[in-house]
């Protein structure tokens, strides 16, 4: 496993994974937030590279991505930003990036820049398993975790997807589980059990986890919880101090 990411999961009983959009609401905010990351209860930070057609994102994150893109944030500016602050950040940073961006940049060039900017893992939500082998191998050679996404499907397919993975598995939990319906919770528990049956990698649950109540409820079933939309909403305040304080409330035990 990726050393830095695996260390986090080895050191902590439960891991908090957060998400921001690079350059939203501004480049200055993103830089300042990253410099204050150690003051938050986030253990691993996903950073979204703005993209014009973010298929896996909801309205709020898509809008944030659009605003950042319109402001001139590109893959290069994201790399430049991260390179400028990487020596002051102690927590693992993970890219959430759409494959078209990686392909357009050039896979080898993209990975080289990831190494230089301190990226420890990559999530590519629109990359089919059948096409993931090449990039997962190249990432592994550069000590960058390829973090696979798995959703409810056959155990055999989950096993194949997980076999390419490193760092942790991103389990898509948008099963209506943030409510109180017992049937949905049972589906979630069965799904997580299936994932754990076929892989020794830690499992983190994302999609639909928005409140502290959600975080507390889902923590008991997985190794990590991922919060995206709520954190992006907080960053829209353009106030780093407020964002840090509210994130800590969000992940409060």
Where are these regions (language model features)?
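Glycine/Thr-rich beta-alpha phosphate-binding loop at enzyme active sites
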Residues: 61, 71, 158-194
